[in-house]
A protein has these predicted regions:
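C-terminal-of-GTPase-core extension/linker across diverse P-loop GTPases
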Residues: 39-50, 178-301, 318, 336, ...
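Switch I (G2) and immediately adjacent beta-strands of P-loop GTPase domains
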Residues: 89-98, 104-107, 291-318
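Generic enzyme active-site microenvironment
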Residues: 309, 343, 382
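Inter-motif core of Ras-like GTPase G domains
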Residues: 325-347
């Protein structure tokens, strides 16, 4: 076995350029060509907000960035310490007019966000001040205003970020709740990429051993041992990848928001509930049935979890074609929601329902409302109008709450139940392994998983080892495509991703 391992090591050195070249390219030729072309220009943009503020940050990146220091601050590159703020007069490069007093920071390549020479100007945030400096930068030869996401694109093309880190950065900029921020910061700092790189390395190692066996494994005893070891390694990896896929899309829910539909009969308090949760009157509340006819949506932060709350039309029989369209939309919202809150009038509902399980209560109410019931779905039952009943309401189910939208009685208890349900539906970014956060990532992981399955099928059937090796190569390529460190066949995905950033990022 010692001799066989020596042969494997020798083969790894001899064949690294041939066997692994296609699966380990960081960038395609077209990407490198575009990277070269983007380096010819120096870009600039306002990176802070466009509204009036105390301080604004203007970012410059590209080969001629040093000209900003020379011509607009009257300094030489040698006189400024990298990454140290220096207070200077900022002037027009043509006529020397004073534009502002501000801080200048110099980031020489490759130690910058973009990997290029970069400059930051921290100036007063008045609109006229910023406009004058932007106009002055346009006067410098080879300078142009950056496109949306172009700074991040250059960072990616320079190898400063991989595709998952770019996605994480985009999510971080869009994060509206604490749990979204936590998930995004983990991805932006490379935790998800680290997981995928580990998988890819494991596959490449198995590829090397399989190739060595094909070339040198004449000994049948050694061959059986190697194939068994490979089979075990890939089976373990397949189980890990399968668990990663079988996450109930919690990472994507956290990223995009949990869709919550409020359903029930007319006048049970659905609109009152959305108003009390949003702390403003977003829906019309009326004693007349059929007031709500269309879906009313609002995005909320509940305990750090993002939700899209949908108020729907009261479910009943109607001959009004407009109301019937609202009823159709209500049923559609319920069928596509991640969580359905069924609102009932506790003052008129039968007390025996309280003895049933949450799922059974939800099923019976859905049947009564002529609404499809999903046994695998997620439901909360809310008994409203607690102020109208004189008897105490005893609830034994964690997913059943009682409150009065009129007085607020029971609201805190309902919010606790709602937060618990949201925690089940979403990930806990601080306690769990990194999760899939986009359909792009999920697609590549699914395809990689199928290739691992095909590899195991070939080995179990004692099939062609060359075909088995090809399945590993394809699986490694799919994993590499998630971080875009595999061979990239198209750049459309990257273009769409970078365009989602704002100007100046």
């Amino acid at each position: 076995m010692y001799l066989f391992n020596d042969k494997i090591n020798m083969l790894n050195v001899m064949k690294s350029n041939r066997f692994f070249c296609n699966s380990s390219l960081f960038l395609s030729v077209s990407c490198l060509r575009r990277y070269t072309s983007t380096r010819r220009s120096t870009i600039f943009a306002l990176s802070s907000g466009t509204s009036r503020s105390a301080i604004s940050v203007i970012r410059i990146s590209g080969p001629n960035s040093v000209e900003v220091i020379r011509k607009m601050t009257r300094l030489n590159k040698e006189n400024i310490i990298p990454r140290k703020a220096l207070l200077r007069k900022i002037v027009d490069p043509n006529n020397g007019d004073l534009l502002d007093n501000g801080l200048v920071l110099w980031f020489p390549h490759p130690h910058s966000f973009t990997g290029e020479d970069s400059v930051e100007l921290h100036v007063h945030g008045g609109i006229a001040v910023v406009s004058s400096i932007i106009s002055a930068l346009q006067k410098l030869p080879g300078f142009r205003i950056a496109e949306a996401g172009e700074f991040t694109k250059r960072a990616y093309l320079a190898g400063k970020l991989d595709a998952t880190e770019v996605e994480g950065l985009a999510d971080l900029l869009r994060a509206e709740t604490e749990t979204q921020r936590r998930q995004a910061i983990r991805q932006a700092t490379g935790e998800l990429a680290e997981l995928y790189n580990k998988w890819r390395t494991s596959i490449l190692t198995c590829m090397a051993h399989l190739e060595a066996y094909v070339d040198f494994g004449e000994d049948q005893d050694i061959g059986h041992e190697v194939l068994s070891s490979l089979q075990y390694a890939i089976q373990s990896l397949k189980s890990e990848v399968g668990s990663h896929l079988n996450d109930n899309r919690r990472g994507e829910r956290l990223r995009n928001g949990v869709r919550v539909a409020i359903i029930g009969e007319p006048n049970v308090g659905k609109s009152s509930l959305i108003n009390i949760l949003s702390r403003r009157n977003v829906a019309i509340v009326s004693p007349y049935a059929g007031t709500t006819r269309d879906i009313v949506e609002i995005s909320l932060d509940i305990g750090g979890y993002p939700i899209v709350l949908c108020d729907t039309a009261g479910l009943r029989h109607s001959v009004d074609p407009v109301e019937n369209e609202g009823l159709r939309r209500a049923r559609e919202a319920a069928s596509t929601a991640d969580l359905v809150i069924i609102v009932m009038d506790v003052s008129t509902g039968p007390a025996k329902l309280l003895q049933l399980s949450t799922k059974e209560m939800a099923r019976l109410e859905c049947e009564r409302l002529n609404l499809s019931f999903n046994a695998e779905g997620n439901y909360l039952v809310l008994l409203n109008k607690l102020d109208l009943t004189s008897s105490s309401v005893s609830i034994n189910q964690s997913a059943v709450s009682a409150l009065s939208c009129k007085t607020g009685q029971g609201l805190e208890e309902f919010l606790v139940d709602l937060e618990k349900k949201l925690a089940e539906l979403c990930a806990n970014p601080m306690q769990e392994a990194p999760l899939i956060t986009s359909s792009r990532q999920r697609h590549h992981v699914q395809v990689a998983f199928r290739h691992l399955e095909k590899f195991l099928d070939i080995i179990e059937q004692q099939g062609d080892l060359a075909l088995a090796g090809e399945q590993l190569r394809r699986s490694a390529k799919q994993i590499g495509s998630i971080t875009a460190r595999g061979k990239i066949d198209t750049e459309e995905m990257l273009d769409v991703l970078f365009r989602s950033f704002c100007i100046g990022k």
